């Protein structure tokens, strides 16, 4: 096995952390097996990622509580000081390992997956092959997936709107997850097959994701009014926990996975817009002022030459990126380009979320109209939307990619709005969704990041994934089938593990404990990095 790049301190520090975790987990499994054998009692694990609450009382017996997806860590883990937990871990105390066996299992599995990433993308153990595009095959595979999804996962929903109390279901969760799912499939196939002719469509899909960032976060904060530190930390964990480890293990810049910093930025901007003077959010004029302020910030940042570079240059260490194939570009070029393409659409998402209750009430009244009037209004909406979509397609979408990118920030709302209108024009369309796509829509972040290393291949730090991972050489379709199956399975596990570990390390109602956890994780990471750096310097 040949390693393609020198080992970094970050990679050594990761191994220093993950190897003891794996040993501790294996030992905890042995302890559980020995205890179960001793008591002649078998405990079944319903889910490998569940968090177990174990209280080991020698005089009173043993109680093991398991079930479903994990929601909280063991009570002893939360109640014990971090220093005590760390000492108990390092000394391999039996009771501690048994109490936190499922947590150790989740951490060990997460580490093993990251090692698999490294093996696939940074060693010669698994081969690589060239991309090959066929429009016929590309469209065939996507249409086949739609047919299979429609035949096996079409589901009718009867959820009621929290606003109107009726089954209007305008832009409901099932629908937006489905939307993310089919866009993600095309986005991934675009990368796998190098389907460059769909470049402009992919730009619209990414705008759709950013639109949902504005729409979803605005809806949550406006309705729930939860601006707590725990909620904020949970968001940042969801967006950046996995990608941070990928940057360490693969020695990549954060901006290689540009979707993550983009969504982080626009999530922060929505959080700031609604969190500042949040007690006045119910006042329409205040909300109008906030949205106008968002537009003003974007105009100042992206439309006035030089401002972007001045503002972001102090963060070039985090947001800078150098493509090995284009080393002469400025470090902030990629961040400027990517964030600038979708600089307005998140605000459009906020506006649509703000008027969502109003539109639902309009739709409720429309459904109560007589059939003739209802049909004429819906026909008009479909006609106007289709005509607007046609004009956009003819005069914007058909432009070459360079010219299209200039218009994209100002026009991406058009196809998104057209899709929303057509997808929600009838009650029947709103009630049904393809749950296969909705399921895929829930793991878009994991599939986006994982594709770089276990589906595609770049082989070098910060390299774009120009190659395909090849487990079965000379059989491209069989290889596609196998690598895709592994890739999706790993993405699902990463989604579950990220949520599992989030529930362990981010308490929802204890900010003091949360702060202690953050400080402890930072201190442990720093110590491991220093040790890794020293170990690499010793040979020299």
From Swiss-Prot:
Q: Which GO molecular-function terms appear in the entry?
A: oxidoreductase activity; transferase activity
Q: What kind of membrane protein is this, topologically?
A: Multi-pass membrane protein
Please state what class of enzyme this protein is.
transferase
Claim: Repeat is one of the keywords in the record: no
Superkingdom field: Eukaryota
A single cellular component GO annotation: Golgi apparatus
Q: Which family does it belong to?
A: Belongs to the PC-esterase family. CASD1 subfamily.
Biological role: Probable O-acetyltransferase involved in the acetylation of xylan during secondary wall biosynthesis.
Q: What is this protein called?
A: Protein REDUCED WALL ACETYLATION 4
Organism encoding this protein: Arabidopsis thaliana (Mouse-ear cress)
